[in-house]
């Protein structure tokens, strides 16, 4: 792998001059800049984002903390963010927390150590006060504990309402909502609330169930679904909070 010394040797310029080009510091002639750019391309030199950050207050590194990447939502999210950061000349530092608060706190410290210029956070465990005390900007995705942090969120409650209205409109009268994790605050909780609101308004039988954390971690709900259908044979409509759950409902039911 090429180094800054190789670029210096290729161009005949000092390492200091090459470094100034990389960091866009001081006066650099167009000829010098083009010479360095040509050498970088020829040598396929990849500047180390962290090394470049050592002389600055921050880097061109963005941190991303997700609970896991086995779930399609997070794997798709990761792919999209990675593409966006790469296209804009940023590096992405990914952490998988498994939803553990201690792990997430350690990952925040790693972000500090690596001088990230920003963090994308998928966690419901950090209060706005904790987020505001960080020295870099934070964007929360689908998890905004007290509703005050900068966040990108779906209207999950409306999604739950639409699901209930669709099932009831199809003639279903004994509904089950399978959404949310026991003991954890999740976006799916709002879907269950919206689902319940419509069921009460329409006066249909329903039950809202959450599932143990270990099922979410394993992404295997088949035993739970089988038990629900066995214990509630009258069930004629199920609201699944994710595509994974929906596919496993179809697998068990048919």
Where are these regions (language model features)?
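N-terminal helix-turn-helix DNA-binding module of bacterial transcription factors
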Residues: 1-60, 73
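Alpha-helical recognition/docking segments in bacterial nutrient-uptake
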Residues: 2, 60-165, 169, 227-230, ...
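Acidic/polar helix N-cap motif
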Residues: 6, 24, 100, 155-156, ...
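Short beta-strand segments enriched in small/hydrophobic residues
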Residues: 17-20, 54-68, 174-182
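Generic recognition of short, well-ordered alpha-helical segments
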Residues: 31, 49, 75-77, 106, ...
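Bacterial carbohydrate/catabolite-sensing allosteric modules
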Residues: 42, 83-88, 106, 136-140, ...
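Short gly/ser/thr-rich secondary-structure transition/capping motifs
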Residues: 42-48, 101-102, 120-123, 250
């Amino acid at each position: 792998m090429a180094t800054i010394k190789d670029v210096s040797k290729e161009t005949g310029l000092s390492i200091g001059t090459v470094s100034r080009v990389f960091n866009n510091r001081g006066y650099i002639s167009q000829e010098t800049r083009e010479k360095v750019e040509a050498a970088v391309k020829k040598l396929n030199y990849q500047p180390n984002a962290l090394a470049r950050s050592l002389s600055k207050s921050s880097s061109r590194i963005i941190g991303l903390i997700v609970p896991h990447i086995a779930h399609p939502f997070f794997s798709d999210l990761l792919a999209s963010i990675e593409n966006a950061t790469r296209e804009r000349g940023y590096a992405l530092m990914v952490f998988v927390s498994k939803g553990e608060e201690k792990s997430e706190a350690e990952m925040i410290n790693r972000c500090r150590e690596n001088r990230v210029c920003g963090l994308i956070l998928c966690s419901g465990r950090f209060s706005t006060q904790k987020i505001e005390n960080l020295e870099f900007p934070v964007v929360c995705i689908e998890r905004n504990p007290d509703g005050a942090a900068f966040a990108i969120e779906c209207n999950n409650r409306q999604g739950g309402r639409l699901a209930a209205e669709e099932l009831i409109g199809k003639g279903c009268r004994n509904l089950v909502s399978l959404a949310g994790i026991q003991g954890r605050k999740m976006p799916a909780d709002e879907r269950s609330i919206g689902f319940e609101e419509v069921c009460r308004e329409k006066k249909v039988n329903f039950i809202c169930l959450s599932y143990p954390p270990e099922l979410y971690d394993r992404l295997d709900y088949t035993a739970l679904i089988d038990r629900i259908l066995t214990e509630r044979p009258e069930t004629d409509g199920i609201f699944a909070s994710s595509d994974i759950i929906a596919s496993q409902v179809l697998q068990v039911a048919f």
